[in-house]
Design a protein with these regions (language model features):
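Gly/Ser/Thr-rich phosphate-binding loop
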Residues: 89, 114-119, 128-197, 210, ...
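Adenylate-forming
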Residues: 40-43, 53-58, 69, 106-108, ...
Length: 342
């Protein structure tokens, strides 16, 4: 037709161009992470890493073209970037917050009928304790993935009670594995045909990922024995940018050594106890901060709690809890200590 250019004529008049699309082990992006060490390292992730991670999200976490996902994490972070790739592959809808704020989250969920969210435990706690929580309709949400830090038992119990339409899914991962590696589905948060609930667990290995617990020499440990989480699969990073020694220390014999201490039960569920380097050793005894944090957080006056080890002449290390109270609440140090002993 007049004024139109044919496809064949267009191709014939254009010189060939090299395919610039990245693939397989070609570098896709560098994401900086300090983990809990405080020293940023550039994690090199390939196109294959992101494709594998996206398939994992779709297979493990129910992403589909019906998903309306709210991004509460920055896209510079793998907690934001990894689901962004996966949701695009699935054909879902992106709802992006400019920053996390409880009211912004409430409004976005209500306005856009968001049905999938990802929050760190602190965000969940902030929402539950916000004075305007009851004013918003949050019932459109079906799935809430949570992770990045341990969630206190009291916070999870409150979330389940106050948000009955939400199905909570625990997710564990790291930048070096393109995010999700272990997942705890909703059904395992309760007793059922599978047996007693596994709410204390991070979950089992996600789709396409191998996970084991190893000793410092990389030998796999028996079930129930604490060690370090090691991960293998197509999601594992290429390495750290310009840090060959750090890469060699982290990836050994094809396994990514995470630095997270955990044990695995007979059913393959992973129970995280602490960062390997952050375990508190007092009088020769291993003390896991999460266990103490759960005990402190069970007190009704406590809003947030973090447990650390501090130098002690007698015991080597002593346990210290840093506590923030709920508005209008009061409790003494002695009362909290007595509570933890009960």
């Amino acid at each position: 037709p007049e004024g139109m250019v044919g496809y064949e004529a267009l191709i014939a008049a254009t010189p060939p161009m090299a395919d610039e699309c990245g693939q397989d082990d070609e570098l896709c992006g560098i994401y900086y992470t300090g983990g809990t060490t405080g020293h940023p390292k550039g994690v090199m992730l390939s196109h294959k890493n992101f494709i594998a991670a996206s398939i994992n999200w779709i297979a493990t976490l129910h992403f589909s073209d019906q998903t309306r996902y709210m991004h509460s994490a920055g896209l510079f972070h793998l907690a934001g970037a990894s689901p962004a790739f996966a949701l695009t592959l699935a054909g879902g809808t992106h709802v992006c917050l400019p920053k996390f704020d409880a009211v912004l989250a409430f409004e976005a969920i209500q306005t856009h009928r968001v049905n999938y969210v990802l929050f760190v435990p602190t965000m969940i706690n902030m929402m539950l304790n916000h004075p305007d929580f009851e004013r918003y309709d949050l019932s459109s949400v079906r799935y809430c993935e949570y992770g990045a830090s341990p969630i206190p038992d009291a916070v999870l119990a409150a979330a389940i009670a106050k948000l009955p339409s939400w199905e909570f899914i625990q997710g564990y991962g790291m930048t070096e594995t393109a995010a999700l590696t272990v997942s705890l589905p909703w059904r395992f948060h309760f007793d059922g045909e599978h047996g007693p609930h596994k709410r204390q667990a991070a979950g089992r290995a996600a789709y396409g990922v191998d996970v084991k617990i190893v000793d410092p020499d990389g030998r796999e440990l028996p079930r129930g024995t604490p060690g370090e989480i090691a991960v293998r699969g197509a999601q594992v990073m290429l390495g750290y940018w310009n840090k060959p020694e750090a890469t060699a220390a982290a990836i050994r014999d094809g396994w990514m050594h995470t630095g997270d201490g955990a044990w695995m039960d007979e059913d393959g569920f992973i129970y995280i106890v602490d960062r390997v380097k952050d375990m508190i050793i007092s009088g020769g005894e291993n003390i896991y901060s999460r266990e103490v944090e759960n005990a402190v957080h069970a007190h009704p006056a406590v809003r947030e709690c973090a447990v650390i080890g501090v130098p002690d002449e007698k015991w080597g290390e002593a346990v210290m809890a840093v506590v923030a109270l709920k508005a209008g609440q009061a409790v003494t140090e002695q009362e909290l200590i007595a509570h933890c002993r009960t």
